[in-house]
């Protein structure tokens, strides 16, 4: 019979040790034995709480931006998948919360940003929340590292080449390789995007498709035949001082 005092002591020791390890080390630790796996599998444990509180900006934890990710571990994961301050237009900066980009009011420029982590395998979903005016063009979707992040004029930059795929929320058009691929979603009088709505982007690297959801309603497959390349969450914007947030959710739930 296991001594409950000894078990509690062991738990507390592991908690302290794991709190001081780097996240990559925690991933390795979870593969050591079943006991450690179950310990770290608790996504609201004090270990994940400690890492979350020490790595995430306090501003993001106090807001409702992360309301779709309920555990400390998923909040932490979302932070490491957020917009990259090193992979965006020079006219864009990432706000202190770590999840929201701000486009500076630069005339005759279209500006884009990519997420920190791209995907080549598996199924992934993330939320995009446009928190400022859309302007004449506002596009959400995906791109490879080769896609441009800035250009002259007010254009649909995301979807303007063969390295990016986007949905223009202003006109409800799908864009790729500089061409309009059709209307989306395929509904009569499809409602336009309202500022503040959460759109879920669903990338399936196994079926090579990109889809979207709005208000928990699946809008259908937008793009098929995506290439076997690493693809990154991306948006492009034209309106000065507009802001766009992105929260990675993980594997999409079916049904």
From Swiss-Prot:
Keywords: Neurogenesis, Synapse, Ubl conjugation pathway. It holds the Pfam family SPRY. One of its GO terms (cellular component) is neuromuscular junction. Residues 61-253 form the B30.2/SPRY domain. It is found in: Synapse. InterPro entries: B30.2/SPRY, B30.2/SPRY_sf, ConA-like_dom_sf, F-box-like_dom_sf, F-box_dom, FBXO45-Fsn/SPSB_families, SPRY_dom, SPRY_FBXO45. SMART domains: SPRY (SM00449). Pathway: Protein modification; protein ubiquitination. Residues 3-51 form the F-box domain. One of its GO terms (biological process) is negative regulation of gene expression. Required in the presynaptic motoneuron to down-regulate the levels of wnd and restrain synaptic terminal growth at the neuromuscular junction (NMJ). Component of an E3 ubiquitin ligase complex composed of hiw and Fsn. Belongs to the FBXO45/Fsn family. This is F-box/SPRY domain-containing protein 1. It comes from Drosophila simulans.
């Amino acid at each position: 019979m296991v001594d409950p005092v000894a078990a509690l002591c062991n738990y507390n020791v592991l908690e302290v040790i794991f709190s001081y390890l780097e996240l990559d080390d925690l991933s390795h630790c979870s593969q050591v034995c079943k006991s450690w796996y179950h310990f770290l599998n608790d996504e609201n444990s004090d270990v994940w709480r400690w890492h979350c509180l020490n790595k995430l900006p306090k501003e993001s934890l106090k807001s409702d931006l992360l309301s779709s990710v309920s555990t400390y571990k998923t909040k932490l994961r979302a932070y490491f998948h957020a917009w990259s301050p090193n992979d965006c237009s020079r006219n864009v900066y990432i706000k202190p919360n770590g999840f929201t980009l701000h486009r500076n009011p630069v005339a005759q420029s279209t500006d884009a940003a990519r997420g920190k982590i791209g995907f080549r395998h598996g199924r992934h979903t993330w939320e995009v929340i446009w928190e400022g005016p859309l302007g004449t063009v506002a596009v959400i979707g995906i791109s490879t590292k080769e896609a441009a992040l800035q250009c002259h004029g007010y254009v649909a930059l995301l979807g303007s080449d063969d390295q990016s795929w986007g949905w223009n929320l202003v006109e409800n058009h799908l864009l790729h390789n500089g061409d309009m691929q059709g209307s989306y979603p395929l509904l009569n009088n499809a409602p336009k995007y309202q500022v503040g709505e959460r759109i879920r982007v669903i990338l399936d690297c196994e079926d090579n498709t990109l889809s979207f959801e709005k208000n928990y309603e699946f809008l259908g497959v937008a793009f098929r035949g995506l290439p076997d390349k690493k693809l990154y969450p991306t948006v492009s914007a034209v309106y000065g001082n507009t802001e766009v947030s992105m929260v990675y959710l993980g594997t999409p739930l079916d049904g």
